[in-house]
Amino acid sequence: MLLLWFGFFSFIFGVVIYRLYFHPLSKFPGPKLAALTSLYEFYYNVVLGGRYLWEIERMHEKYGPIVRITPHELHVADPNFYTEIYAGPTRRRDKDPRLVRLAGQPTSMFATVDHGLHSSRRAILNSYFSKKSIAGLEDMIQGKVQKLVKRLSMACDQGTVVKLDAASSALTADIISEYAHGFFPFLLDLSKFIPDKVLEKLWFHAANILRLQKLVRAQADVALQNGGKVDGQATMFGALCDPSLPVQERTLDRLQDEGFSLIGGGTETTTGTLKIVMFHLLNEKALLLKLREELEQYPSSTWADLEKLPYMRGTINEGLRLSGVITRLPRRAPDEALVYKQWTIPPNSLMSTSSHFVHTNSDLFPNPLAFDPERWIRAEAAGQRLEHMIVTFSKGSRQCMGNHLALAELYLVISTLVRRFDMDLYGVTADNIVTHREYGFGVPKERGEGLRVSITRVRDP
């Protein structure tokens, strides 16, 4: 027994000495406890509840722009180094296999560790998400938006409080499901976001997530048996089960994982951004009135025309800047040592930069926590290409391929809401909206019941 204890403590002592003095990252600055054990991160993220990102922020204030934040990971808080970590397709970047398991869809593109395999999987679907392809969906998106207008108009007539973020989730889930899989889960048609909490139970309850997974699996099975078609309609499943692909890439599990991943990725970013934008517009009505004035001067409602409106574009950019995935997305560069200032990062080291540190950088964005659409107009007038610093969709070879779809939805939905409805916040404060914790996406200090609004008037089109 004594020998067992001696062996155990000898092992622990060896790990401590190795991590502090001989590990490839041992020369990098940071707290010794973070270098020794991942329990340091565990304490902030689990015990304190999603607060490690702000502890990393404190580390950078103390130790500088590059910090060892776990025994095996570096974090760099320099926006100019972002595209080195999240590099383009000619430079290999692998994911951390320990982290992608959390995604829950192990054969999806999002959970693919290897750079080469990810590139080949992405190539299958790239054309579906090009800006040209998404522009071709505009009539379908507009049709869904008009259904939303009808539901919100009914809520106005009935004096019903609406959960605007739940409505957005329903809308975006319908759009990506119909486009990708040839079906939609009827969330918008059921209008369960009005007047009770049924939609929340339907969409976010674990049992119903499983139900949706089964539905996606059933559609994938139909597609596999019918040359990629569902009910005679061509879908993305057709590309995923193309006979030219390797057999292992055409399994039912693979189609289900990719299909469900598309729904999740096609819903959360858009909804989170819309929630941030609409909260700030309704919380500071001068912003809303300025946007409405610009929209009334240019009555066209096409995505292409809306993108040209300076204040509209600034509003969307501010929403993107203050929302989205803020968790670290670690990468490895297995084939090269990266150099940051006087530091050489050894090949295959885990490294990351949270979008939070780019989007709240006060040199790029003075008064970074303020929602200020005009900062983008000022930057453009000064010749600054500030939009290149929006990393909500990440950058490089693993950038979110659904960015054009998300942007189209945001421009079309937000412009319609501002044009067609007068509404007020209903029992919602900044503590229910502004990011205070990190659980992948930013989470507010107080969860509340979502972005609840009362609609006071339906305006003429």
Curated annotation (Swiss-Prot):
PROSITE patterns: CYTOCHROME_P450
Major location category of this protein: membrane
Keywords: Heme, Iron, Membrane, Metal-binding, Monooxygenase, Oxidoreductase, Transmembrane, Transmembrane helix
CDD domains: CYP58-like (cd11062)
EC annotation from Swiss-Prot or TrEMBL: 1.-.-.-
Record pathway: Secondary metabolite biosynthesis; terpenoid biosynthesis
GO cellular component: membrane
Topological relation to the membrane, as annotated: Single-pass membrane protein
InterPro entries found in the cross-reference section: Cyt_P450 (IPR001128), Cyt_P450_CS (IPR017972), Cyt_P450_E_grp-I (IPR002401), Cyt_P450_sf (IPR036396), Cytochrome_P450_monoxygenase (IPR050121)
A GO MF term: monooxygenase activity
Keyword Iron set for record: yes
Intracellular or extracellular location(s): Membrane
Tree of life domain: Eukaryota
Cofactor: heme
Any one GO BP annotation for this protein: conidiogenone biosynthetic process
TM ranges: 2-22
Keyword Magnesium: no
Binding site for heme: 400
Gene3D superfamilies, per database record: Cytochrome P450 (1.10.630.10)
Pfam family, one: p450
Main function: Cytochrome P450 monooxygenase; part of the gene cluster that mediates the biosynthesis of conidiogenone, a diterpene known to induce the conidiation. The bifunctional terpene synthase PrDS converts isopentenyl diphosphate (IPP) and dimethylallyl diphosphate (DMAPP) into deoxyconidiogenol. The C-terminal prenyltransferase (PT) domain of PrDS catalyzes formation of GGPP, whereas the N-terminal terpene cyclase (TC) domain catalyzes the cyclization of GGPP into deoxyconidiogenol. The cytochrome P450 monooxygenase PrP450 then catalyzes two rounds of oxidation to furnish conidiogenone.
Name used for this protein in its record: Conidiogenone synthase PrP450
Source organism of the structure: Penicillium roqueforti (strain FM164)
